[in-house]
Curated annotation (Swiss-Prot):
This is Ribosome maturation factor RimP. Required for maturation of 30S ribosomal subunits. CDD domains: YlxS_C. HAMAP family: RimP. It comes from Shewanella denitrificans (strain OS217 / ATCC BAA-1090 / DSM 15013). The keyword Cytoplasm applies. Keywords: Cytoplasm, Ribosome biogenesis. The keyword Transport does not apply. GO terms for cellular component: cytosol. Belongs to the RimP family. Disulfide bonds: none annotated. The lineage of its organism: Bacteria, Pseudomonadati, Pseudomonadota, Gammaproteobacteria, Alteromonadales.
């Protein structure tokens, strides 16, 4: 069964791309009777507040017609930011050599929260170097992954 996030990605990719943006990813946070739908968009030129507003109007219209969410929800549209979330194998691949943190569904090496360097991505398998040790993590075991911003 497809997750709500995957259904939303399928539903919203074309409308977001029609506006000239990349649909970076979607987070669906279920909080009781109210939920949050976070839509992350990106562009080579960067993302501005007007881009978020335009995308929000378009996404809202699609969600109103398709009605995929049965609870009340708040729609948030933003850029991925400097600590960008990672959703796909291609996104992890693009950040090989960068520091990242991941929250896991099932523990790896006794932990559900890991910080390390993305060292390899093969298919749907991520290798994260944590304290000098390579840990193998299935991407479908990652609940949430983010780049750790360096300043």
């Amino acid at each position: 069964m497809a997750t709500i996030e995957s259904r939303l990605v399928e539903m919203l990719t074309v409308p977001v791309e029609a506006l000239g943006f990349e649909l970076w990813g979607i987070e669906f946070v279920h909080a009781g009777r109210h939920s949050i739908v976070r839509v992350f968009i990106d562009s080579e030129k960067g993302i501005f507040i007007e881009d978020c507003a335009e995308t929000s109007r378009q996404v809202s219209a699609v969600l109103d017609v398709e009605d995929p969410i049965t609870t009340e929800y708040t729609l948030e549209v933003s850029s991925p930011g400097v600590d960008r979330p990672l959703f796909t194998a291609a996104q992890y691949q693009a950040y090989i050599g960068e520091d990242a943190k991941v929250q896991l569904t099932m523990p790896v090496a006794g932990s559900r929260n890991l910080k390390g360097v993305i060292s390899k991505v093969e298919g749907q398998i991520l290798t994260l170097n944590v304290d000098g040790k390579d840990l193998i993590i299935a991407l479908d075991n990652i609940r949430k992954g983010n780049i750790i911003a360096k300043f």
